[in-house]
Amino acid sequence: CASFHKNIFEELKKDYIDQKLVKFEHHSFPLDLAALNAELIVRCHADNQKKFQLLGEIYKKQNKWAVGSDIKKINESIKKIGSELGLDKIKMNECLKNEDAQDQILNERIEAQKKYKIQSTPTIFINDKQYENEHKYKLFKKAIEKILKKNEI
């Protein structure tokens, strides 16, 4: 996911999302406790723009925080990123302990796995076409342009 965000998402955002030509939805699919906790902190933000900003920072710095097996150290690293973007540490601690939010995220993952047969991350859908292993900007651009061309009046 971090590689997609760094190498593809920013271009898609600039060329299509910011231009309001396509709608982008991000759905969490945590594969471990560190990813689950990162998503819990992302969801602490009420504002969608802030969520994407935080998500971007978490992906950019993933090689720094998602290391080792000490979940306390990992959580502190994620909270540091959140703090840098203005999230309150007390609120982040509350979010990390929110069992309802944890259950919701994990249930969303289970449902997505069942419904869409997701086997790996990131899995990208453009309309109903699934792109699981092919993550190249040119491929997505071609698919989007084809759809946009079809929808011209």
What do these predicted regions represent?
Residues 9, 80-153:
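C-terminal cap of thioredoxin/glutaredoxin-like
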Residues 2-83:
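Structural alpha/beta surface segment adjacent to cysteine/selenocysteine redox centers
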